[in-house]
């Protein structure tokens, strides 16, 4: 059995800390369901039977989620994650309406909250037994006498689904509010208005000019491979990721899975003119001739979402001459809101840059969620 939420969350409660009848404040109830809707990308179904549905989710902490998670015992990269278990039941004694459920939510196996809530779900576009969920009309209800123990569940450990963002990118034009964005990496933007990621993507035919087995086609990733120093460092590897798709706090991230990958010296030192130190032959997918240096432009000041590679990079040859870019080999693409949220919820860097929305989730169509 598990204790209720720890003392670190007392500000969430009405009444005395020691009272058996204490309740979540109405603001906290709404904050919790908004966090589970907007700050969690995907739920992985762990168990489904006539009595209960159990889901698991992992997400990088946001201010909303952090209010409900217990303080970590050690400050590790996994301490920046929320590991969430959701138990949905329909006890007859509660006389619930259609789509209403009694929901127990546990955070990091230490804090537990009890609500009655309306739940709408739809299959997630990646993997099986994955769902996107919207939680609405929450009401506080006291904890039941029998609280499940997450450690007793048979949690799948296999990593059987991987995200390749190229498979979900669709051709796009710069949005109407192309300046309302923030730069995630060279040629990668977060659209504040659309809550979605746009990026410049290499044409698939140019993969033939890349190293054997190479799959990544985002501009920032290609630039990282071209420019990063070969001995590597923590910034080059950029290992701080979780895996929301497979609901694990640790991730073996690859360039195909996250668009945060970028030139190391640009990320950690804000350098804009970088010497080619990596895979020199990759210049062929970016420029019309060999380059010694690459200048990154239009990134930090007044950024805009653009389909023009020449707006973002300048190639400099061995004699200081400018080398034209291979503009025809690159197109602007966009990810939908669900895939964008999945990437952000698994990346500590992007979660810091991309603020979670404060608005209530509205399905794009009445039939979007069951």
UniProtKB/Swiss-Prot annotation:
Keywords: Host cytoplasm, Host nucleus, Late protein, Virion, Virion tegument
Compartments where found: Virion tegument; Host cytoplasm; Host nucleus
Subcellular location, principal: virion
Residues spanning the membrane: none
Domain of life of the native organism: Viruses
Pfam families the record matches: Herpes_UL16
Signal sequence annotation: none
Assigned GO CC terms: host cell cytoplasm; host cell nucleus; viral tegument
Quaternary structure (record): Interacts with cytoplasmic envelopment protein 3 and with the capsid.
Family (UniProt): Belongs to the herpesviridae cytoplasmic envelopment protein 2 family.
Function: Plays a critical role in cytoplasmic virus egress. Participates in the final step of tegumentation and envelope acquisition within the host cytoplasm by directly interacting with the capsid. Upon virion binding to target cell, a signaling cascade is triggered to disrupt the interaction with the capsid, thereby preparing capsid uncoating.
Protein name as annotated: Cytoplasmic envelopment protein 2
Native source organism of the sequence: Equine herpesvirus 1 (strain Ab4p)
């Amino acid at each position: 059995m598990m204790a209720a939420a720890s003392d670190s969350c007392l500000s969430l409660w009405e009444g005395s800390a020691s009272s058996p009848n204490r309740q979540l404040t109405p603001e906290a109830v709404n904050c919790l369901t908004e966090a589970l809707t907007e700050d969690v990308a995907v739920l992985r179904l762990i168990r489904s039977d006539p009595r209960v549905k159990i889901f698991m989710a992992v997400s990088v902490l946001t201010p909303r989620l952090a209010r409900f998670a217990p303080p970590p015992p050690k400050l590790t990269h996994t301490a920046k994650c929320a590991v969430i278990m959701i138990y949905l039941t329909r006890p007859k004694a509660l006389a619930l309406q259609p789509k209403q459920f009694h929901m127990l939510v546990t955070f990091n196996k230490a804090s537990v909250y009890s609500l009655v809530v309306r739940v709408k779900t739809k299959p997630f576009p990646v993997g099986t037994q994955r769902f996107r969920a919207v939680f609405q009309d929450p009401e506080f209800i006291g904890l039941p006498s029998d609280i499940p123990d997450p450690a007793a569940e048979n949690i799948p450990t296999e990593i059987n689904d991987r995200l390749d963002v190229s498979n979900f990118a669709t051709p796009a034009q710069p949005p109407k509010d192309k300046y309302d964005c923030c730069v995630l990496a060279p040629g990668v933007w977060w659209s504040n208005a659309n809550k979605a990621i746009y990026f410049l993507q290499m044409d698939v035919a140019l993969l033939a000019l890349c190293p054997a087995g190479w799959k990544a086609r985002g501009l920032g990733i290609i630039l990282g491979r071209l420019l990063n120093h070969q001995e590597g460092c923590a910034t080059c590897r950029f290992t701080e990721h979780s895996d929301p798709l497979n609901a694990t706090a640790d991730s073996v991230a690859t360039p195909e899975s996250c668009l945060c990958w970028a030139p190391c010296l640009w990320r950690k030192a804000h350098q804009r003119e970088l010497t080619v130190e990596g895979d020199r032959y990759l210049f062929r997918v970016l420029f019309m001739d060999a380059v010694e240096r690459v200048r990154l432009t239009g990134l930090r000041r007044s950024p805009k979402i653009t389909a023009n590679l020449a707006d973002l990079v300048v190639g400099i040859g061995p004699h200081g001459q400018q080398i034209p870019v291979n503009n025809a080999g690159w197109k602007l693409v966009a990810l939908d809101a669900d895939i964008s949220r999945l990437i952000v919820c698994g990346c500590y860097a992007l979660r810091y840059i991309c603020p979670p929305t404060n608005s209530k989730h509205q399905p794009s169509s009445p039939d979007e969620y069951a």
